[in-house]
Amino acid sequence: MSQKQRIDQQPAFVLHTYPWRETSLVVEIFSRDHGRVALVAKGARRPMSALRGVIMAFQPLLMDWSGGGEVKTLVRAEWRGGQPLLTGRALMCGYYLNELLVRLTAREDAHPALFEAYADALSQLGRGDVAPILRRFELTLLRELGYGIGLDLEGDSNRPVDPVQQYVYIIEKGPVRLAGDDEGLPGVSGQTLLDMAHGDFSRAETLFQSKALLRLLINHYLGGQPLQSRRVLKELQEL
């Protein structure tokens, strides 16, 4: 980006904020057309700042910014409305989604489909069982980031996954039929793999096994570094 470039009316969500100097904030956002962007919100911590009541996580915003460095300058933010405030477990799950985006996405790498998946997940978190919502988002995240998560073809033979067979998932290879020396790897049924490929988490076994499989994959791509939000939610057994 050049120093003079300005972005206007960009749909975005706030992922994280932290204080900067005496009265300002650095705001990490996830935008539809520009991906994850860091912005300085000058004076946002002042009591009378127009930005103070707008820069909120999990709320759909329209944002204007300018600048060409790694950290841009926030010019304007407008609340778009329509998203209920998250509370309780739904709120903690929202923090989990945000942490995944901060840790796994690159700066200024646009993923419009991932943006829509994130917006959909936020809108659904307060309405019922959060587990299927989290699993769909995790799967979309890994696919959108180009990790090539194959689910419907066997990794060693390229044959269609058999719903009645048992598999282990080998990272960078895919599902392989379970053998005697595969102890220690999470097993997954062929039916679960096919359900995941179609985004169907209605079966209890699929929901249980997909949680273990997606955790294995996410931990790998995080380089084994723990997620703070997952530690907080461990006792709630939602992640």
Swiss-Prot record:
InterPro entries: ARFGAP/RecO, DNA_rep/recomb_RecO_N, NA-bd_OB-fold, RecO, RecO_C
GO cellular component: bacterial nucleoid
Family according to the record: Belongs to the RecO family.
Keywords carried by this UniProt record: DNA damage, DNA recombination, DNA repair
Domain of life, per lineage: Bacteria
Free-text function comment from the UniProt entry: Involved in DNA repair and RecF pathway recombination.
Gene3D superfamilies named in the record: Nucleic acid-binding proteins, Recombination protein O, C-terminal domain
Name used for this protein in its record: DNA repair protein RecO
A biological process term (GO) from this entry: DNA recombination
Cysteine-cysteine disulfides: none
A Pfam family hit: RecO_C
HAMAP family, A to Z: RecO
